Amino acid sequence: MKKIMAINAGSSSLKFQLFEMPEEKVLTKGLVERIGLPNSIFTISVNGEKITQTLDIKNHEQAVDMMLDEMKKHGIIQDINDLDGTGHRVVQGGDIFETSALVTDEVEKQIEELCELAPLHNPANLMGIRAFRKMLPNIPHVAIFDTSFHTTMPEEAFLYSLPYKYYQDYGIRKYGAHGTSHKFVAERAAELLDRPIEQLRIITCHIGNGASIAAVEGGKSVDTSMGFTPLAGVTMGTRSGNLDPAIIPFLMEKTGKTAQEVINVLNKESGLLGISGISSDLRDIEQKAEEGDERAILALDVFASRIHKYIGSYATRMKGLDAIVFTAGVGENSDIVRARVLEGLEFMGVYWDPKLNAGLRGKEAFINYPHSPVKVMVIPTDEEVMIARDTMTFGNLK
């Protein structure tokens, strides 16, 4: 029995989950928010009950220290030596990390070098890794990369039609994201279908505030919608998804904004929020659409239409399709979005049952008619359990 921590460190937050492995039993989970700001919030789950404290937590090291103290205080662990390993989500692994990796000084340095490809995420992920390595120097720490699952994409899928030297010199290519989630639900889909994953062609739809679609053929990612950064692909909560790059200099000229300011608009003020003018939260938009708000209806139409395009494209890419999987906050909980995405796909052999779809929230289920050649599933994602599994494997803890 091993105790493994799954960690997701943000610039001012630290999300943690403690597993007993290999049973995959969750012993506790929690969240530290507003690190480095006044009135930081520390939340931990003890016997299913949330305990929250407000205090000042200066940095990630202090957050880790407090987390360990609280786990001891509540009897979740007797001593820090009870912990056998930690696994850390890292957003960008470039084309260096095809799998998860045991963190060494060299690996840490490589993650730092990749910060320019994910300036919003990798520096924060690295802060978490450094804090845990300092506090717990005698156990293995493993980095689990969002991009690793997508390193199996062929060159024709990941390359942009730019001068080839930009790829050689600067690493400009499609990297994708949400790889841990796409991998988890694709593998789970194969289990539910009771078929070897090597025989399956699956489209996984990770739809949350950030969203990406992946083509998974024979258990490997062969294409995905996010690109060089998580700004590309389908319409998202506040992100634009794909657009004509000439719009950027055009907007700079028209608005007087710098390139970075325009990128901020594309990242934070666009997507569902930009089109609807209401919210980036799909629940708010669905409610307004039901009330007949035209912009809310339009936002939903655009959202579904972009996902449609990827499903059609990826089914063509794989020369057929066995299953479509919905996951993440919206994919698991919005029957409205699922219905809009599935509408009109009968020509591809997708026959979904509106009764099975209606009201389904956060549960694992098939939502297709029995005779449907293409199966449609809702599978709640569990990135933390994937992090714990890889920590066992790459930390040599099995």
Curated annotation (Swiss-Prot):
Residues at the catalytic site: 146
Cofactor: binding details: Mg(2+). Can also accept Mn(2+).
Alphabetically ordered keywords of this record: ATP-binding, Cytoplasm, Kinase, Magnesium, Metal-binding, Nucleotide-binding, Transferase
Cofactor(s) this protein requires: Mg(2+); Mn(2+)
Site (Transition state stabilizer): 178, 239
Location, primary (coarse class): cytoplasm
A GO CC term assigned to this protein in UniProt: cytoplasm
Binding residues for ATP: 15, 206-210, 281-283, 329-333
Biological processes, Gene Ontology terms: acetate metabolic process; acetyl-CoA biosynthetic process
Pfam families referenced in this protein's UniProt entry, alphabetically: Acetate_kinase
Pathway of action: Metabolic intermediate biosynthesis; acetyl-CoA biosynthesis; acetyl-CoA from acetate: step 1/2
Recorded GO MF terms: acetate kinase activity; ATP binding; magnesium ion binding
Top EC group: transferase
Keyword flag Ribosomal protein: no
Top-level division of the source organism's lineage: Bacteria
Transmembrane segments: none
Catalytic activity: acetate + ATP = acetyl phosphate + ADP
Binding site for Mg(2+): 8, 383
EC number(s) per entry: 2.7.2.1
Positions that bind substrate: 89
Record-linked SUPFAM superfamilies: Actin-like ATPase domain
Family stated for the protein in its record: Belongs to the acetokinase family.
Subunit structure: Homodimer.
Function: Catalyzes the formation of acetyl phosphate from acetate and ATP. Can also catalyze the reverse reaction.
The name this protein goes by in its record: Acetate kinase
Organism of provenance: Macrococcus caseolyticus (strain JCSC5402)
